[in-house]
């Protein structure tokens, strides 16, 4: 992963790549609460919801897809 990326953006991309906050945490050597915190901070900074969390499934919102596309 690009070392120049903001840690919150790195976390977002890891969650998208792994499909899981827990797996992203393991990949990044973070705790799951730290991953959740990074995503919450990013959502607050951008004033959008990035993920929908329904019945144990994680999916990107329309706005989240745009953020991910720009981050890559």
What do the PLM-derived regions correspond to, one by one?
Residues 5-11, 32, 64, 71:
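The N-cap/first-turn positions of alpha helices
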């Amino acid at each position: 992963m690009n070392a120049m990326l903001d840690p919150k953006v790195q976390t977002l991309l890891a969650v998208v790549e792994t499909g899981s906050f827990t797996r992203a945490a393991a990949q990044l050597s973070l705790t799951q609460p730290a991953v959740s915190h990074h995503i919450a901070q990013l959502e607050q900074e951008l004033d959008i919801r990035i993920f929908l969390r329904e019945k144990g499934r994680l999916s990107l919102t329309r706005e989240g897809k745009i953020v991910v596309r720009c981050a890559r």
